[in-house]
Amino acid sequence: MPKVALLNQTGSQVGEIELAEAIFGIEPNESVLYDAIVMQQASRRQGTHDTKGRSEVRGGGRKPWKQKGTGRARQGSIRSPQWVGGGTVFGPTPRSYSYKLPKKVRRLALLSALSSKVQNNEIIVLEGLAFDAPKTKDMAAVLNSLSVERKALVVTADYNETIALAARNIPGVTVIDAAGVNVLDLVANDKVIFTKDAVAKVEEVLA
């Protein structure tokens, strides 16, 4: 079983915690990780792009000149695609880019992301995390004591508004609860800070 140091809010070690081998100790599957990241990014696309076809462009209802006798090529509308200002042929239309990988694949990707973080010493486990009031300086002090200098993901057992408000003005810091742990957030952050209770909840959900 992988072991990591158990720290308090001041960054001092107060013990060790054993992580479940089946969740935090597997061999990461990079191919599945890639597929899961692409899936999440695709689902976040707005897909609101739109172009107008010849039937949607304003104007062009009248034939620009008679069919025969002018010496010019026949034309039916000034909004035909070959005209400047005409409609677009097969242009993009609004659509959803989201799709879902099989459940087993998504689970394997999440386990791979968690295990990769453990192997790279990018997981920090806190004995607890609590503030009397949602003050940014308190969260900044905790991150400073943990030597977190870049992007960090803070995972709590349940949604904690005080912690979320304390962290929202700190660039690069994201707070989620254990139920919201996902591959993209894990991979996108340099450090992942779990509370002890959050680890237990993640292990319970993924067991």
Swiss-Prot record:
GO terms for molecular function: rRNA binding; structural constituent of ribosome. Residues 60-71 have a biased composition (Basic residues). One of its GO terms (biological process) is translation. Residues 47-59 have a biased composition (Basic and acidic residues). GO terms for cellular component: ribonucleoprotein complex; ribosome. It holds the Pfam family Ribosomal_L4. Coiled coil: none annotated. Residues 43-80 are annotated as: Disordered. Keywords: Ribonucleoprotein, Ribosomal protein, RNA-binding, rRNA-binding. InterPro entries: Ribosomal_uL4, Ribosomal_uL4-like, Ribosomal_uL4_dom_sf. One of the primary rRNA binding proteins, this protein initially binds near the 5'-end of the 23S rRNA. It is important during the early stages of 50S assembly. It makes multiple contacts with different domains of the 23S rRNA in the assembled 50S subunit and ribosome. Forms part of the polypeptide exit tunnel. PANTHER family: 50S RIBOSOMAL PROTEIN L4, LARGE RIBOSOMAL SUBUNIT PROTEIN UL4M. NCBIfam families: rplD_bact (TIGR03953). Belongs to the universal ribosomal protein uL4 family. Part of the 50S ribosomal subunit. HAMAP family: Ribosomal_uL4_B. This is Large ribosomal subunit protein uL4. It comes from Exiguobacterium sp. (strain ATCC BAA-1283 / AT1b). The lineage of its organism: Bacteria, Bacillati, Bacillota, Bacilli, Bacillales. The gene is rplD.
